[in-house]
A protein has these predicted regions:
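Short glycine-centered segments of the SAM/dcSAM-binding site in methyltransferase folds
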Residues: 43, 138-139
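A short glycine-rich, Lys/Arg-flanked "PGG" loop and its adjoining helix->strand segment in the class I
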Residues: 124-136
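A short acidic, Gly/Pro-enriched loop at the edge of an enzyme's catalytic core
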Residues: 99-110
């Protein structure tokens, strides 16, 4: 992204990242695709794609006509490129900030976030960008900390869901997919 300054966001890996990646590939993503009826042949963007673990799975299960990953960390994107090659997956990889994405308006039918948004300062700006690049009728799937939600369900819903509405997104449905740490939700653009 020329002309913009990328800020390094604090990243704390999951305590058992290898185990998490295995669960994500074998169970979480397939369950998510089925539960939310993610469309085949669409345009999919993963924000905060990191090492690109989810991209081959999304490619295999959804057969998108466009698949892209965005991450702020160039080193992780190099690992993602290696991972894509190993799996024979074709996807665009972009270095950039979710708060200022290098994509045209309404460029994606599905945007997925497997735990990036809650690490970002000024997440309202990120939601503005997500709403901008999400096509009408598209789906935004994001992961939140379930422990926060379960401790304070009313406060959590009151804080996050109006923020989605402010950005032209409405809650479509949500599903508890991750038993202990996180929760997946989906919002659709109007």
């Amino acid at each position: 992204m020329s002309g913009s300054r990328l800020e390094q966001v604090e990243y704390r890996p999951f305590p058992n990242e290898e185990g998490r990646n295995s669960r994500q590939v074998q169970w979480e993503i397939p369950t998510l695709v089925k539960a939310l009826s993610l469309p085949a042949g669409g345009r999919i963007l993963e924000v905060g794609c990191g090492r690109g673990i989810a991209l081959p799975v999304l490619d295999r299960l959804c057969g998108p006509r466009r698949l892209a990953g965005l991450d702020i960390d160039g080193e992780l994107l190099m690992e993602a490129a290696d991972n894509l090659r190993e799996h024979g997956t074709e996807a665009e990889l972009h270095r950039g900030d979710v708060r200022q994405m290098p994509f045209a308006d309404e460029a994606f039918d599905v945007i997925v976030d497997f735990g990036t948004l809650y690490h970002i300062a000024r997440s309202q700006t990120a939601l503005d960008e997500i709403a901008r690049v999400l096509a009408p009728g598209g789906t935004f799937v994001y992961e939140t900390k379930a422990s926060q939600f379960l401790s304070h369900p009313v406060r959590s819903r009151g804080r996050r869901l109006p923020a989605l509405a402010d950005h032209g997104l409405r809650r479509r449905r949500w599903a508890m997919l991750w038993a202990s740490r996180t929760k997946a939700q989906a919002a659709s653009s109007r």
